[in-house]
Amino acid sequence: MNSPSTDQPFGDIERIFGYADAIDDSMPMQVVAPEMALMSCFTRQFCAALIRTAEACGGFDQHPDDPVPGHELSLAQISPRLFDSLQNDLGSRIWPQLQEQWQHIDYHGLNDAFIIKYQQGAQEELRLHHDVAQVSGSIKLNDDYTGAELEFPRQGFSNAPVPVGSLLVWPSLVTHPHRSAPITSGTKYSLTLWFELPLQLN
């Protein structure tokens, strides 16, 4: 279940605008497949608040210029303050862990962070592709659905066993093409992170 417990002192407003009750550091980074790492990131309560807030905002749209269109909603559209809080958190808490795996990466912030919604009759799957970023990440926001696994054919890995709130990361370009399998029941929500490419030097 994704609903916060009744004794939890934080509501959605505190979570979304104050980043309250967001951080989960219970699981250290572990390598789960070739050049892929997994670590805890968000609490279930924060994930559920993201879903409720995204649905309240609406606007899950496919962008016409996107070569791999999905029903997406950027966190920057929901709240620039939320986007900034996430960007700062990832830079200070998550990126140093990633540098243990990939020593020569530098943090240049987020290119985007967006929620993708999958359901039958709408966005049911996502074709095989790779991203245009330095590092990509995916956070499963709920698990009350079937199908829609994030699959990496070259690495022989899927996110089926990944817990809600955990962050799966991989190098974005060339080596890690991935897809979302068809959803078979329920509604899936996931948060995609694109870490910005290194800045061009003049």
Residue map of PLM features:
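Proline-rich intrinsically disordered, low-complexity coils
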Residues: 4, 9, 28, 34, ...
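Catalytic core of non-heme Fe(II) oxygenases with the double-stranded beta-helix
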Residues: 92-202
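Short charge-dense sequence patches
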Residues: 1-7, 34-49, 86-89, 115-120, ...
